[in-house]
Structure formats: C-alpha cells, structure tokens
C-alpha cells in the first residue's frame, strides 16, 4: 500500500533520533497523517506477509470487553509481553470500549449517565459502565431515521482513562477513534499517541479498517475512508534495515473482506473471511517492550 510506504520513507528521511523507555532508540516524527479509501479494497499490507488471523483474534478480543488475555493467548501471543502470569493487563482497550467506568459522584455542574441510560449497565462489583461500541451502532442507525441526529458528530470511542493511563505499564497507544458520515459513506478517524511503524501500525490500519467495514454493514452504510493520525510516529533503529527492504517491494493488489450476514454482536472469528490476499515474504522485526 503506497500510503504506508510513503510514511516509512517520510520518517526515515525526516525523523529525529529519540531515546525512550524500551532501551532501543527511535527516529520519530510529529503528527503524521494519511487516508485510505476502503471502497477500493481492504488495506492489509502486501509488501510483507501479514498475519491476518492474529489481528482478527485481537479485534474480537477488543470487542469482547475482556480486561485479561486468558482467552486471547490461546489464539495469539501478541499481548503476552505486557500481561502478568494470570493474563491480567493494567490497560485493555476493549474493557474501555465496552465497559467504560461511569462516575456516580459528580463534580458541581457535571452530569453523567445512570442505569436509565440504554448503554449503561452495572457490573457485579457495583461499578456503572458505558458500552461505547453499542452507542456508536445505535446512533448510526438512528441517524438514518431521526432528522435531529442526521448529521451527528459525537460518535467517539475513548480508550483513555487518565486515572489508569498515568500508572499503567502500557497505556493505550491508539486511544480514540471517531466515526463520521458523508452522504451514505461511513468514515473512521483514529488518533494514536505513539505508533511503531514496522510492527504496530500495519495491525492498527488493518484492525480499524475492518471494524469500520463491520459497523458500516451493520448500520446500512457504504464504506468510506479510514484516516489515521499518529502523534509520535517512529521507527526503532533495529527496524530500519527491514523497512528499507520493504521500500524496494512493489505493492500488490489489495485484498477483499467478506462478512457473514449476521448482526454485529453475533459475529465470530469464522464469520470474517479474507479473500484474494497475496503478499511478498515475511520481514521479521523484534518487539520493543
């Protein structure tokens, strides 16, 4: 995909060397953005082999709302480095996507949803939580029938909670995304505080593009664009040679995604099929923990 290769080249040409917590220095840039037209195909990278099944298991783990990887690690090991022996994570994206904590004590002048809100439930421990994904789906559907919500601009999902993020071992990197409708096309914009261009960004691109396709199908929209802003877009120094190799490879035709005719919350791993995917060989990159 040309947009990805353009990003790699830009960071290699313009990045500034930075030290970081991992012990492996990076070359970094500020606020890199790109767009992909999802109507032209599924943007799974072809200039190296991508492990689609691992990404798909990760996406369904997010959508499960689980705060641990006990089930995920049976399918893929991509989160093992950040979990404890029992599979617990200090931060889990899906936990906030589907179960964002709702305060029951408000500051003066503030209001919060309660159990009368259709997207709020109470956990076994008594905590009120908000299902942001269901809110997005219900709002997008209502926009088709309710003139007061026809051009909604409040379809935002947040995985960042300051009280958690300031003490977590690895707070969310891709921490917020928003949906937007133009005509009958559903668009998604992802904001990421930190992006590992060799390893993380290809997965993020594939994951959120697929999520956009799934929600568009559920809500009766055509797929539009996926836009991505990475605040600290960086390349680890031990990834440079592999990425230079990737730059020499010509992108191949984009693949397609087939989604089963089921409701969004009934979809499983087997209901998402990758079609016509061809790629160049694997390029191995070490994970910086």
Regions from the PLM with identified roles:
Residues 1-289:
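Terminal, non-catalytic protein-protein interaction segments that mediate quaternary/complex assembly
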């Amino acid at each position: 995909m040309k947009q990805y290769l353009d990003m790699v080249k830009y960071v290699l040409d313009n990045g500034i060397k930075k030290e970081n917590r991992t012990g492996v220095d990076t070359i970094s840039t500020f606020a890199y953005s790109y767009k992909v037209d999802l109507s032209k195909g599924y943007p799974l990278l072809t200039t190296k082999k991508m492990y689609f099944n691992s990404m798909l298991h990760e996406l369904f783990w997010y959508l499960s709302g689980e705060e641990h990887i006990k089930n995920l690690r049976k399918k893929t090991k991509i989160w093992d480095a950040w979990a404890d022996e029992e599979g617990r994570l200090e931060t889990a994206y899906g936990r906030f996507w589907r179960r964002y904590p709702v305060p029951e004590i408000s500051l003066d002048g503030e209001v919060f949803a309660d159990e009368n809100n259709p997207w709020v439930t109470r956990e076994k421990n008594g905590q009120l939580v908000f299902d942001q994904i269901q809110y997005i789906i219900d709002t997008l559907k209502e926009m088709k029938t309710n003139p007061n919500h026809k051009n909604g601009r409040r379809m935002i999902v947040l995985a960042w909670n300051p009280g958690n993020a300031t003490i977590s071992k690895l707070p969310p990197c891709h921490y917020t995304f928003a949906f937007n409708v133009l005509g009958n096309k559903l668009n998604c914009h992802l904001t990421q505080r930190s992006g590992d261009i060799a390893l993380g960004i290809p997965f993020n691109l594939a994951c959120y593009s697929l999520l956009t396709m799934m929600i568009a199908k559920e809500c009766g929209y055509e797929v539009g664009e996926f836009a991505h802003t990475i605040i600290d877009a960086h390349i680890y120094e031990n990834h440079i040679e592999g990425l230079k190799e990737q730059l020499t490879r010509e992108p191949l035709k984009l693949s397609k995604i087939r989604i089963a005719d089921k409701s969004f919350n009934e979809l499983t791993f087997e209901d998402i099929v990758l079609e016509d995917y061809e790629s160049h060989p694997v390029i191995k990159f070490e994970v910086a923990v």
